[in-house]
A protein has these predicted regions:
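Short, solvent-exposed coil/turn segments at beta-strand boundaries
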Residues: 2-5, 26-32, 50-55, 80-85, ...
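Mid-chain, well-packed structural core segment of small domains
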Residues: 51-87
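Tryptophan-anchored aromatic micro-motifs
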Residues: 1-19, 87-94, 107-110
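C-terminal structural segments of small proteins and small subunits
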Residues: 80-103
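Short, surface-exposed coil-to-beta transition loops
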Residues: 18-22, 41-46, 69-75, 87, ...
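N-terminal first-folded block
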Residues: 7-40
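Short hydrophobic/aromatic-rich beta-strand segments that constitute the beta-sheet cores
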Residues: 9-11, 32-35, 56-60, 86-91
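Short, solvent-exposed aromatic-acidic interface loops
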Residues: 38-42, 62-66, 91-98
Length: 110
């Protein structure tokens, strides 16, 4: 199992001002949680469980820069890059305020 504790991840897409949210992950056994901020995200909290293959199944709540709140769920599947860092392929579904779904990628950063 991948140990996500202390790892930081940044979205591969940037906002209009060139910034992107950065998340710091924590792990105890199969329990994983993270907090994120940056770009269009004022604050985001994530919590979920990690499967033996490193896949994380989590829920999230966030406050966006415009003051909207959003809640949803995400399944993050890891891939190890050539340089040893982790890339997470995220399939997400947002419930409110504008329901939607999509795919994003976040990569391990220092």
């Amino acid at each position: 199992m991948i140990n996500y504790d202390g790892k930081r991840f940044r979205n591969t897409e940037r906002s209009a001002d060139g910034t992107a949210p950065v998340a710091t992950y924590h792990q105890a056994g199969d329990l994983v949680w993270a907090e994120a901020a940056g770009g269009d995200v004022r604050r985001c909290m994530l919590v979920g469980v990690c499967d033996p293959d490193g896949t994380i199944r989590m829920g999230y709540t966030m406050v966006l820069a415009n003051g909207e709140t959003a809640i949803g769920r995400c399944v993050s599947t890891p891939r190890t890059l050539d340089d040893g860092r982790i890339l997470l392929h995220e399939e997400w579904e947002r419930y409110q305020p504008r329901p939607g779904s999509g795919v994003s990628f976040i990569e391990e950063t220092e």
